[in-house]
Amino acid sequence: AQYAKENGITLIHNNTTAVLEGIYLKRKLKLPLIWHVHEIIVKPKAISDFINFLMGRYADKIVTVSNAVANHVKQSRFVKNDQVQVIYNGVDNAVYHEIDASSVRDQFGIAQNALVIGMVGRVNAWKGQGDFLEAVTPILQVNSKAVAFLAGSAFDGEEWRVDELEKAISDSPAASQIKRIDYYSKTTELYNMFDIFVLPSTNPDPLPTVVLEAMACGKPVAGYRHGGVCEMVKEGENGLLATPNQPAELSKTIQELADNTEKREQFGKASVKRQKELFSLESYIKNFSDLYKI
């Protein structure tokens, strides 16, 4: 509070539902509070209700990263609809853009004419690596030029998840066509190496940034129809979505893109256009600048 006073701070921005200090500052200094919500908290319900109660009572404006998050927050009896505003996260196109990835393919020992189906995500309980393997295996089995590529590590203490995943890969009938690496910092290179980007999250991801990054790199997207991806992907325009947690249906959407080079290119161009129009860093900054003028 002392710091806020001394530095002439006139507005508080609480980032994520885990940050509660803004309430104290708002009450002590009588400043407006913007609460920025990135998560969809369903369980435990008591925690969800408590956070919604605090937001409803103290936030002058609740900003959510997607309509999926906004709709979840609005379901609470503690929150008024006009308290909630959606501001999509932006992607920096100076970092994420189309590049020639032939050298990246060489680096990973992938043929230039291979069809690369990729996913990027932490190895945890719900990012869906198991569903990804289940969905891509039949495609790999009928197409010897297809390669499945997974990138991502586990949290410290959960390395067993990686061991399980590695075992699932080695046990796969298409093991020789599946490659997995740990966390890789130059994700732009990976997205550009992919022909199809897949988001197989088994729980609704509020706003999966990896999808926006892949779109910025000109990729068609396949995924499950829940969470924020439904706002990023316009079905039939820059991607295809399947019923959540149905790997066989997800497989069909990937297959549809795998079979049609023209559709992949068309969807990829549409991805770039859509990302720049709706999910750019510029629009993100402008939307917050306008909001800060309250």
Q: Where are the predicted features?
A:
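Acidic anion/phosphate-binding donor-loop and adjacent secondary structure
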Residues: 71-78, 82-83, 90-107, 113, ...
